[in-house]
Amino acid sequence: METEHGEETPPPAVPSGTVAILRDGQSGLEVLLVRRPASERDTFSGLWVFPGGKVEAGDITHGDDEVRSALRAAVRETQEEVALQLEHHELVPLNRWEPKPVKALAKRFSAWVFLARATDAEVVVDGVEIREHDWFAPRHAMNLHSEGEIGLSPPTWHTLHELGQHHSVDHVLAWATNRAPEHYYSSFGEDSGHTVIVWHGDELVDGNADARHRLWLIDGAWRYERNV
């Protein structure tokens, strides 16, 4: 599709839902991550992610907003990928992620991240979409990423950063329930020779001098900075 000026209109972002499943481990809060298989067609090839996937026709009910459809997709995909049946009403919306349209991105996702308490059921991966899983303390997963042991996407890394501020499932769910989800409309920039992903409020987005809301993508040491 083209605009009246002859420019191509980027395709709309694909709605999707993913869920960070939480449990209290021996040393504190833990979250389930699953590893996507290597595939040239998979945007998240080889990365460790939360269970989830795109919204399909059966997830949509007349009158729903996007978050409700994404929630259904997250519940359905979790059951398909890791055999855990979550209750819809127990999921708490955390944030919504969407990259800014750029030509380099053939496909974009508008991804809702939800939080949910783990059930007592055993995790069983489907062996197709998912072949590995593990429970991680959020900060440990971030450290493994810094050391090059596991791959994470920026939204997953940022979510782990938020989870790492909490010591228990009760604590993080209470925090998430009493805040409004944020919309992270991601765009890339450069500062001091380093690539950064910037969001609402940052100097590179809104022009406010010295305002920071960004993720520095420095090899081996991603760093989140926010003062707005």
Explain the meaning of each model-derived region.
Residues 1-130, 135-228:
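N-terminal leader/linker segments that precede catalytic domains of diphosphate-processing enzymes
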